[in-house]
Amino acid sequence: MQFACSLLIDQLVQHLNAFKPDIIATYPSMAVELASQAVLGRLRITPSDLLLGGETLGHESRLAIQNAFTCQIHNQYGASEFLPMAWECAFEHLHANTDWLILEPVDSNYRLVKDGEVPFTTLITNLANYVQPVYRYDIGDQIIFNPEPCKCGSSFPRIEVIGRKDDVIRILDKKGGYVTLLPLTLSTIIEQSGIYDFQIHHHSPNKLTIKLVKKQSNSSSQIQKCISQFKNYLGSMGLAHVHLEIEMVSNLNGGRSGKAKRIFHEEKNGKINSTS
C-alpha cells in the first residue's frame, strides 16, 4: 500500500491506523513526524521494521524514531541511477555495494580525494545496468569513505553521506576567506535541541535564517537551546559576526519529491535556490 506524501498528516495517520502496516518505507523526516504522532497517542501502529532512505538520517532523528517505535530501523542510501548503493549494518554504518557499482569521491577538478576527506561531489558507475550504462555520472552528493574496518566484519567500505553539494553553506569570515558549513552538522545541532521541522536559509554574505514550524512540541526552551547551540557553533568556526534570525512559520515548503529540503540559498535577486 502506498500513501501520497502530499497527504495532510491527520489523513496519513488515519490511513495508517486503519491499515496497520508491519513494515513502513519512508523518508527519515516523515518517520520523525510519525514518531511525534505516536508519542502524542494519535498514531496507533506497531510496525516491525522501518526502512528509511532518500535523506540523511541523523543521530538525533534516529533516537526520536526509536523512542516512539520499538522496532528495527534500516537505513539505506540510493539514487535513481542505482538503488540501493549502500545498506546499513548492525553497527549503524553504511556499506557501499562496491561489487555492483563504483563510487568516486572527487574534488572540483574531478580528481579523487583521499579517504576521510569531504569531496566536492561523487561520481557513480553502475556495473549492473546493461540496458542504459551509467559511467562516472555526477550524482551531486558528498560521500566520505571511511578506511577503518567495521566491527560487523563486512569487507565492503564504510561511507558517510554528508548531503548534496548544493546544500553546503560557505560563509565569508572576517579575514576575507570562506568557511564551509556542512548540512549534516547544522542539522545535528538543531535536532539536539529536540526540533526536527526546520529549514536554514542562507542570505549572502553573512546572514542565516532558521525557519521553525509553530507547534506545541517546539517549546520556548527548545527554541532558545537551538539558538544558543547554533550561535556557539558559529563562534567556534570563527563566524560570530554572522547575523542569525529565527522565523516561526505555519508550515515548510518541501521539495518536489516530498523530501525535507533543509538548506536554501537566496541569490542577490531574492530568488530562492533549491534543488530537491
Where are these regions (language model features)?
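Active-site glycine/GP-rich loop and adjacent strand/helix microenvironment
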Residues: 1-276
